[in-house]
Amino acid sequence: MRQRITYIQKPSLPFHPSQTTLTRDSLYVESLDAAREERVTFSFDELPSELWQVLRQCHQLHIRWASERAFEAVSPLSSRISPGLHVFYSPVEAGRAKRDSEGREPLCTLLKKVFDDELRCESPEKSFITPPILSKRFASTTAYQFYELLPSLGNLVTYIQQKFCGTDDKCHQRAASILSADSVDINYDSISHALTMSGFWSQAPGEQGWTETIGKHEGGTDKVEIGLLGAEPASEPEEIKVGGLLAVVGQDEELKPTLFSFPSRHHPLHEDATYSVTFPPPTGLHPTMTISIAPEALKEPPRRPDATCALHAYLTLPSKLFGDKYQLSTTDPLFLKSHNLASLRAVAGETDLEAPDWSISRWGSNWLLELASPSESDEVAEEWNITIPLHLRYLPPSESGYQPASVPWPVVFWACSAEDGTKMGVNPFDRINLGWEGLFGPRTMFYQLHPSPSPEGGNLVEELEVPVLTLKENSGIFNSQVIELGTFAVISIGFLWVLWKLGLVARSSGIRPQHQRNPGKRDKAE
């Protein structure tokens, strides 16, 4: 097992060498105000059998989870996804995966056991969607994609404690810390045969910063790498420069200074470059998502003169909600201008306009929209509003007459072309398989806007109330029994009316005797 812990400080935050103490077998950190990423890599023989039995059928498996809480993503860990659980999967062989001894599909069975037994996951063929491939050169795009809004990782913590920790109390504590993480990534590919799990905390759980002792593992065979880093101004627009201190616990006697730069796909914007999402009431069955972008976020990112940039939004819509791809893909300039949209770049998943939610087997749909932005000559003093017309599917009836629908916030970013020849190689902080970055070319750079929810709400998920059929008795004329009886009565009356009309037609068009012509007159005429 290999462990890497990285603390990332803002340049404005104070740091003193006395806050860290490195000994022969541990590193002590005291009151460190920083973001924290922990990454653990397991080899195949360190995994439980039920886990590697599923992984050996996977060519790629990438799991992403983000909290519903708003958090700050610092450079170089600035990439974002919509809140919830995202699964990206490619099988080793095309076709159906081998089922277990009880006839269950192995991947969905494992996902339910690890994350939540209520996941709407039956099999990749039935529950996953197939993402579009707009850039064939971007090899990271997987064959299947799954999503579900998952507020907590409590089941994952329990699974790790039972399958990996045993009676190790420190391991139990480290696993429990996942509950306060802002994002968690799990990666596996058939080339490396290694499972990597990483967690990101934008800040320490307490107000005093990080205070902890990181020791080397018993036996001394596992490697523990520590980094205390901070981003610095880079000389090139496509690069990120990082400097700080590094150490390997149990090998190094002191922290070693370091400074390095690398091309990066993901870059943060100024902290004032924010956006918020609302659904103006009343939402009804045709809600409109409004993305309000701060004026600071409308300025194009720093780029080379020959580069082009465009503002985008990537929507993750559960099956209850969908867009009309025919409406959003229009080239009508009046419609696009009225909503501040430029074009629909990509769509994948359920887009049936008439299907009710209970007939949908796949989880939902993804939408990549290019957004219109004001020209440089236009001065925008207030927020720039993007409106996206959406639609709700028919949902099962309820006693209250309403059903809840949770909608995660979209990811909003600038996508800019990099200089020809720029190699976006894998760097220590690179993050791919996010769903949306695979829809662009391999040398595209992304500049992330920061979600900024209202102080009253605080979450990156919007809650809608969907009007449905009322099951409750004595609730007026719109309860289920009245509608069922009324429907039966109308159909019966209509059927009887049709029979009555057919009877009248039959009576009025009875067979009449034909008059025989006089053959004599015919002969006389001849």
From Swiss-Prot:
The gene is pbn1. Residues 1-484 are lumenal. Glycans are attached at N385. This is Protein pbn1. Required for proper folding and/or the stability of a subset of proteins in the endoplasmic reticulum. Component of glycosylphosphatidylinositol-mannosyltransferase 1 which transfers the first of the 4 mannoses in the GPI-anchor precursors during GPI-anchor biosynthesis. Probably acts by stabilizing the mannosyltransferase gpi14. GO terms for biological process: GPI anchor biosynthetic process. It comes from Emericella nidulans (strain FGSC A4 / ATCC 38163 / CBS 112.46 / NRRL 194 / M139). Pathway: Glycolipid biosynthesis; glycosylphosphatidylinositol-anchor biosynthesis. One of its GO terms (cellular component) is glycosylphosphatidylinositol-mannosyltransferase I complex. Belongs to the PIGX family. The lineage of its organism: Eukaryota, Fungi, Dikarya, Ascomycota, Pezizomycotina. It is found in: Endoplasmic reticulum membrane. Residues 506-526 are cytoplasmic. Its main location: endoplasmic reticulum. The chain crosses the membrane at residues 485-505. It is a single-pass type III membrane protein. Signal peptide: none annotated. It comes from the Eukaryota. The keyword Glycoprotein applies.
